[in-house]
């Protein structure tokens, strides 16, 4: 039996491909993209309005809610110094900052209130809690809150969920395929 080509294309449009994955996020406040090279995860984060004495973060985990999340926290003090910390939320409305950050800052640019920063971390277990991003997990963008005497105050405004991010699927090879498909 010969299947009409239009039916074949229709069928294939409903089949999930193994390389389909979310590898970026953008809204009016922040944007980010991520890619894995070897066993290292690189995250490019941009905050469009990080003013003095403010912080923003990316949190990872499946909760429940805002508990049990790993965080990368970017802060700007009143001298325009950008600091990157890691931490976790053992319970809602509380973040515990790690003594030593387990991400490596690769690039920082601050132009006015526009922050662009690139960090790397192992894809697998890292930090004092051996938190791994090699499995699919929710990512949460927290646009920020006040920074007072080096302390992170409660965040203000909406938070943004990126559901079931499978960072391990965001490889350089996949990104090249996506880009080449956009060119054609």
Curated annotation (Swiss-Prot):
<feature type="glycosylation site" description="N-linked (GlcNAc...) asparagine">
    <location>
        <position position="49"/>
    </location>
</feature>
<keyword id="KW-0964">Secreted</keyword>
<keyword id="KW-0325">Glycoprotein</keyword>
<protein>
    <recommendedName>
        <fullName>DOMON domain-containing protein CBG21755</fullName>
    </recommendedName>
</protein>
<keyword id="KW-0732">Signal</keyword>
<feature type="domain" description="DOMON">
    <location>
        <begin position="28"/>
        <end position="145"/>
    </location>
</feature>
<dbReference type="GO" id="GO:0005576">
    <property type="term" value="C:extracellular region"/>
</dbReference>
<dbReference type="Pfam" id="PF03351">
    <property type="entry name" value="DOMON"/>
</dbReference>
<feature type="signal peptide">
    <location>
        <begin position="1"/>
        <end position="20"/>
    </location>
</feature>
<dbReference type="InterPro" id="IPR005018">
    <property type="entry name" value="DOMON_domain"/>
</dbReference>
């Amino acid at each position: 039996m010969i299947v009409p080509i239009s039916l074949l294309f229709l069928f294939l449009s409903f089949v999930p491909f193994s390389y389909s994955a979310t590898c970026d996020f953008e809204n009016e406040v922040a944007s980010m993209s991520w890619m894995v090279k070897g066993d290292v995860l690189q995250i490019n984060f941009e905050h469009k309005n990080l003013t003095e004495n403010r912080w923003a973060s990316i949190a990872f985990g499946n909760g429940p809610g805002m508990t049990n999340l790993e965080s990368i926290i970017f802060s700007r003090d009143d001298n325009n110094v950008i600091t990157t910390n890691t931490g976790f939320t053992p319970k809602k409305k509380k973040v515990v900052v790690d003594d030593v950050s387990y991400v490596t800052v690769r690039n920082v640019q601050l132009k006015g209130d526009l922050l662009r920063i690139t960090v790397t971390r192992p894809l697998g277990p890292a930090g004092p809690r051996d938190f791994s991003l090699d499995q699919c997990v929710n990512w949460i963008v927290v646009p920020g809150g006040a920074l007072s005497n080096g302390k992170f105050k409660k965040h203000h405004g909406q938070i943004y969920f990126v559901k079931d991010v499978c960072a391990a699927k965001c490889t350089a090879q996949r990104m090249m395929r996506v880009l080449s498909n956009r060119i054609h």
